[in-house]
């Protein structure tokens, strides 16, 4: 009979097979009441599952990360229960967990409305109040098919067909409603009280636009109502910071239907964009990168050689001319290999670091486009390092150091680094993968920072490092990458002359720090809510006169600051000074300079910050020094 070993090393013996819930009850009534599921020998199981042999057991409660995921998954099933009660003809598709929530795809003959979503949420709350048990039944395949056939759940039957090797499946019953899942799920609906439906959208069956359209209901669920309230507050803050709203408020950019997924940059937004590009150009030059420029439109022949035509054609914009097929480049790497291939390269030329602010275009589905975060036309801070296998570790270590410096300059210090390792389907020997993964792991270790493995998540041809930034709202943004690639140099016949005069293939390291400029600017807008650090702000200082008498000196101040390399402008409108201050505060200009008669007499400026802090009057030279210091700090705090 089983002996159960708990996380603290203590053991409990039973004279009969025992469920997770029964083990929890033997420890204490409080734990039993909080038990969602269990982890038996590292595998998640339902609270009702039997343990028949000696095993280690961790009781899962809402406080555990896995517990939160179980709550969210069970809430998705609860959506199904409510929808089927309200709309009996709806057909349920799938309801997975996503970051901070869940969704359920539903086939129904009309789009859901906000009123429908409110009705579904109300019915879910009513079902939770019934405090019913969720019943799990491991059911033979034939019976599963019978259950869903009798209910007309066509999509569930298709999902069963996708699992030909499964002879028995878990069915979870919410009263009269049944759903299919690997589980585990909550034992009772009382665990689901802290939930909220958040939005509705369209989706396609299996994510393919050629298939039928479905309705998708998104929601979130948490361990308790306090966590839910904090999440809702965070979402409301995120809505206030939406880059589309702030972009319009600050007159940075716009998008329009005639050019879907393309950005119209206005003067202020283009200034911000240029700040990023000039900064990246400087840091790359300081770190040994040579900047290049490659064509936008390239013959199909190159894309066939690189493999993009067969694997990526549906995402490429194509055209024809004079009986030749072309594609607008979706990425820069094949073109960079063409530059490398011009002229004989020696081992003495390596590492060769080639950078381009490459404008790329990808035919993203129209439904996936989102402001400037998800676009069809974008520019990358793209670079490729051609090196020997022995040089990979140092190049990777240098890149990590550079990337972390850049992120710090933009005000991001909470960085997660992950190493994605070999997938099951891959090319290359295990020895090659061992060396490649080992070099990247050693480079990560040299950074002195924590990092983690992502087993099996590498590309089929090589491992990669990913950098994820956490913003002020706790959201994660995957930005930088370093991809090890021995494959493309092989396909495009890149080589160098080794020390022994033999021809060898270089390793190619694909790398980006910001990624898409458009997406990174969208992140910056939301992270700073448009109140950019002085070095990035489109206008760093605005000079405002109180009356026409001070206009000449205001213009002189503007000219002096501009000649010193600052972005300053005058506001000489015949408006009250309070009106001007309010307007430029809303435009989030870092420094507001007010000039009255006293400032003209003393050749000084009265300085206010956009936060409303009165910094007093000071000589123009002193303000210029203050602004220069703020610019030199970039996005770092004064203490850094």
Curated annotation (Swiss-Prot):
Transport keyword on record: no
EC number: 6.1.1.3
Gene Ontology, cellular component aspect: cytosol
InterPro entries per the UniProt record, alphabetical: aa-tRNA-synt_IIb, aa-tRNA-synth_II, aa-tRNA-synth_II/BPL/LPL, Anticodon-bd, Anticodon-bd_dom_sf, Beta-grasp_dom_sf, TGS, TGS-like
Chief location bin: cytoplasm
All residue ranges annotated as the TGS domain in the record: 1-61
One GO term of the biological process aspect: threonyl-tRNA aminoacylation
Named cofactor requirement(s): Zn(2+)
Catalysis: reaction(s): tRNA(Thr) + L-threonine + ATP = L-threonyl-tRNA(Thr) + AMP + diphosphate + H(+)
Alphabetical UniProt keywords: Aminoacyl-tRNA synthetase, ATP-binding, Cytoplasm, Ligase, Metal-binding, Nucleotide-binding, Protein biosynthesis, RNA-binding, tRNA-binding, Zinc
SUPFAM superfamilies listed in its UniProt record: Class II aaRS ABD-related, Class II aaRS and biotin synthetases, TGS-like, ThrRS/AlaRS common domain
Residue span of region Catalytic: 242-533
GO molecular function list: ATP binding; metal ion binding; threonine-tRNA ligase activity; tRNA binding
Residues noted as binding Zn(2+) in the record, renumbered to the chain: 333, 384, 510
Compartments where found: Cytoplasm
CDD domains in the record: TGS_ThrRS (cd01667), ThrRS_anticodon (cd00860), ThrRS_core (cd00771)
CC cofactor note: Binds 1 zinc ion per subunit.
Biological function: Catalyzes the attachment of threonine to tRNA(Thr) in a two-step reaction: L-threonine is first activated by ATP to form Thr-AMP and then transferred to the acceptor end of tRNA(Thr). Also edits incorrectly charged L-seryl-tRNA(Thr).
PANTHER family in the record: THREONINE--TRNA LIGASE, CHLOROPLASTIC_MITOCHONDRIAL 2, THREONINE-TRNA LIGASE
Subunit structure, interactors included: Homodimer.
Entry's family note: Belongs to the class-II aminoacyl-tRNA synthetase family.
NCBIfam families: thrS
UniProt-recorded name of the protein: Threonine--tRNA ligase
Species: Stutzerimonas stutzeri (strain A1501)
